A protein has these predicted regions:
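Conserved beta-ketoacyl condensing-enzyme motif
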Residues: 4-5, 29-142, 146-154, 188, ...
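Acidic, glycine-rich active-site loops and adjacent beta-strand->loop/helix elements
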Residues: 11, 103-106, 159-162, 187-192, ...
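Buried hydrophobic packing segments
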Residues: 74-82, 140-143, 166-174, 230-231, ...
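Short acidic, glycine/serine/threonine-rich loops at helix termini
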Residues: 110-113, 167-168, 193-200, 251, ...
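Active-site pocket-shaping loop/turn-to-helix segments
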Residues: 13, 59-79, 127-135, 153-168, ...
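Conserved small-residue
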Residues: 7, 25, 78, 99, ...
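Structural signature of cysteine-dependent C-C bond-forming condensing enzymes
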Residues: 84-100, 114-128, 149-152, 175-184, ...
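Condensing-enzyme catalytic core mediating Claisen C-C bond formation in acyl metabolism
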Residues: 2-11, 19, 23-37, 43, ...
């Protein structure tokens, strides 16, 4: 069965929609950094926030007025993807559309905030509006209600590769359930000080305002945002191949596992470009070795120096950018590019792209990828 990405959407630190975000990354712009607020110790970390004005329209929806930023960003990206797929606001999707959310730590952040208020300010000060957001599937529930969907709704929790797992799951649903017309896959993530501090204990969080990819591994900077894709059976960007991914049990195993995942995804359909998950951590070294072994001449783009590491949303962001690369026949340039990967694209340029490979290596020892074609 042929499946297609019929529409893409996003809200990012650089734009309120996918089109603006794409224009900004192609222009070589970097989103502004700010210090993370509400720190619990004297350690400081930067993050890449989404401006409040970018989710203002979503916040005006009556069903989302008490929702957190996590849910607002997811709804904004979903509406953008549906509009890109040709579905006007108010279109009744009913039970013909399934919603699948990919998330990493967003709900944990709200749990931390709720109990922090409870313990530091007393029971009367803790906001009850935070409590519903502590549940991982809160964002998916809000969106399903907003779109008046009475069908299937799922939330997948994982690391920065979870978005590709969500897309693979959506492809399985469409393949096995002929009555289902569409799957809306949304990845969303909100930053928090405790998240950066946890990653710092693993030496994976940067203390500066920028980080290098495919160079010196000095840690990453977390970014906020949401990305979405609409999967269906009609025209769009062909979804050539997806997979469940594989797990590695130590960093010594990671290279062999990543090589196997990419080999199985590519087969004989070599991509014209790769959209990488490089983020200034151990993942860069593994991807660099795999790309040099299997795809030594293929241009590689890494978006995270521009927008930050968005964890649960990141591989959906990668898929959106890969789809737009195919649509516009252009590969963006990578900011803060190191010297460990000769094929790393450092400046945006037009080029003929027939297939685009998306790869993701997550901190929770997951590796996944997908392959897109040119419509």
């Amino acid at each position: 069965m042929s499946l297609f990405i019929q529409g893409v959407g996003a809200v990012s630190p650089l734009g309120p929609n996918a089109a603006t975000t794409w224009a900004q990354v192609v222009a070589g712009n970097e989103a502004p950094r700010k210090l993370l607020p509400n720190r619990l110790a004297d350690r400081e970390y930067y993050y890449v926030p989404v401006p409040e004005k970018f989710v203002a329209d979503a916040a005006r929806q009556s069903r989302l007025r008490r929702s957190g930023t996590l849910s607002l960003m997811g709804a904004a990206a979903a509406y953008d993807a549906l509009a890109d797929a040709g579905f006007l606001p108010g279109y009744d999707l009913g039970a013909n559309c399934a919603v699948i959310y990919a998330i990493c730590s967003g709900g944990v952040n709200y749990t931390r905030r709720f109990y922090h208020e409870l313990l530091t300010q007393g029971p009367g000060a803790a906001s009850p509006m935070l409590f519903p957001e502590t549940v991982h599937n809160a964002a998916a529930s809000h969106l399903a209600a907003l779109l008046k969907l009475d069908g299937q709704s799922y939330t997948l929790v994982g690391d920065s590769s979870v978005g590709l797992s969500a897309i693979h799951f959506a492809a399985q649903l469409l393949t096995t359930q002929p009555e289902l017309e569409l799957c809306l896959v949304v990845g969303t993530e909100e930053a928090d000080w405790v998240l950066s501090d946890a990653f710092d204990t693993w030496r994976m969080a940067a203390r500066k305002t920028a980080f290098e990819v495919f160079g010196k591994s000095a840690g990453t900077i977390f970014g906020e945002g949401a990305a979405a894709v609409v999967l269906g059976r009609t025209s769009g960007v062909p979804l050539l191949r997806t997979g469940p991914g594989l797990t590695f049990f130590s960093r010594l195993d990671a290279l062999a596992v990543a090589r196997q995942v990419v080999e199985q995804m590519v087969l004989d359909e070599y991509p014209g470009c790769v959209v990488s998950s490089a983020n200034g951590t151990f993942a860069d070294r593994i991807e660099a070795q795999v790309f040099q072994e299997l795809l030594p001449e293929t241009p590689v783009y890494a978006y995270k120096p521009a927008l930050g590491e968005a964890l649960g949303a990141s591989s959906v962001f990668q898929t959106v950018l890969a789809s737009l690369s195919l649509r516009h026949q252009t590969i963006p340039g990578t900011l803060n590019a190191g010297n460990r990967l000769p094929a790393l694209c450092r400046e945006s340029r037009p080029m003929k792209i027939e297939r685009a490979l998306v790869t993701a290596i997550g901190f929770n020892q997951q590796v996944n990828s997908l392959l897109l074609g040119n419509s």
